[in-house]
Amino acid sequence: KICYNQPSSQHPTTKACPGEKNCYRKQWSDHRGTIIERGCGCPTVKPGVKLHCCTTEKCNN
């Protein structure tokens, strides 16, 4: 699986995730504004954090 892993609105970068079925995108807001985190897997998130998990290549931008 290839997933995007760049933070927020930075230039897209990808990461190979051997054996992983999912990619994810987490989004939340704080004093800096909207923060986006991308990576491999499908993590558990705290209340108030938007989570999008998906199963195709590079699906989490």
UniProtKB/Swiss-Prot annotation:
InterPro entries from the UniProt entry: Snake_3FTx, Snake_toxin-like_sf, Snake_toxin_con_site, Toxin_cobra-type
Entry GO terms, CC: extracellular region
GO molecular function, one term: acetylcholine receptor inhibitor activity
SUPFAM superfamilies (UniProt xref): Snake toxin-like
Keywords, sorted A to Z: Acetylcholine receptor inhibiting toxin, Disulfide bond, Ion channel impairing toxin, Neurotoxin, Postsynaptic neurotoxin, Secreted, Toxin
Tissue: Expressed by the venom gland.
Gene3D superfamilies: CD59 (2.10.60.10)
Cell location: Secreted
Disulfide cysteine pairs (residue numbers): 3-23, 17-40, 42-53, 54-59
Role of this protein: Binds to muscle nicotinic acetylcholine receptor (nAChR) and inhibit acetylcholine from binding to the receptor, thereby impairing neuromuscular transmission.
Family statement drawn from the similarity comment of this UniProt entry: Belongs to the three-finger toxin family. Short-chain subfamily. Type I alpha-neurotoxin sub-subfamily.
Official protein name in the record: Short neurotoxin 1
Organism field: Naja annulata annulata (Banded water cobra)
